[in-house]
Amino acid sequence: MEILMAVLAGIIFMAATYLLLSKSLLRVIIGTALLSHGVHLMLLTMGGLKKGAAPILSEHAKSFVDPLPQALILTAIVISFGVTSFILVMAFRAYQELKSDDMDQMRGNDQHE
């Protein structure tokens, strides 16, 4: 199962890299979100995919699952959601001002020529 998750994380990284290298600002933002999801999947895989009970003291559970990777990923998901929403608002504002989401048109003119 870990191999399948690692391959899936690699595919997500490839798609994110493709989107990050495009000229459209919206594609770059989607690529950034995909990259963060790939990192979340990689962290989950590195934490180990084990079956077990919740880490609550009880007499019936014999093996426990480590809660640290899940807590780390949950925190990273919340942070990436906040950053993505902030970047989307900034991109919308730039689109309102410039009437384009093309990265080459957003650069402006070079005044040193």
Curated annotation (Swiss-Prot):
Leftover remarks: Mrp-dependent antiport apparently occurs by a secondary, proton motive force-dependent mechanism, but the similarity of several Mrp proteins to membrane-embedded subunits of energy-coupled NADH dehydrogenase complexes raises the possibility that there is a capacity for electron transport that could provide a primary energy coupling option for Mrp functions.
GO cellular component, one term: plasma membrane
Major localization listed first in the record, in broad terms: membrane
Upper taxonomic lineage: Bacteria, Bacillati, Bacillota, Bacilli, Bacillales
GO MF entry, a single one: sodium:proton antiporter activity
Gene Ontology BP term (one): sodium ion transmembrane transport
Membrane topology designation: Multi-pass membrane protein
Annotated compartments: Cell membrane
NCBIfam families per record: PRK08600.1 (NF006372), PRK12660.1 (NF009303)
UniProt-listed Pfam families: Oxidored_q2
Oligomeric form and interacting partners: Forms a heterooligomeric complex that consists of seven subunits: MrpA, MrpB, MrpC, MrpD, MrpE, MrpF and MrpG.
Protein name stated in the entry: Na(+)/H(+) antiporter subunit C
